[in-house]
Amino acid sequence: MFRVITCNTNGIRAAERKGFFRWLAKQRADVVCIQEIKAKEVQLTDQAFYPKGYHCFYNESDRPGYAGTAVFAKHKPQRVITRLDWDIVDSEGRYLQVDFPGLSVVSLYVPSG
């Protein structure tokens, strides 16, 4: 069975401080989709943000501390898509797709309202 988990972290650095990655290590997920990372990848230097055994992909917002998505995948995807040619979605890092043979998984952050 293929196990996918999705989670809105409301800030991946704050989630890390609250034990998110310790929790994640127990979940045995094949793919983890994360929304609202609220960080630039250059800020994610600690190894905690790149869990062992996962290929990690981040799609950050142009605006610091806002929106953004990520995907952690046990198997290396054939393709990673971060752009839809839709300015508001692309500039805020709201879409991240990973493609595997016969399956695509999308981490999508859509605001309420």
Residue ranges: model-predicted function:
Residues 1-51, 61, 66-67:
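N-terminal, active-site-proximal structural segment of metallo-dependent hydrolase catalytic domains
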Residues 37-38, 45-113:
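Structured beta-strand-rich core segments of catalytic domains in phosphoester-bond hydrolases
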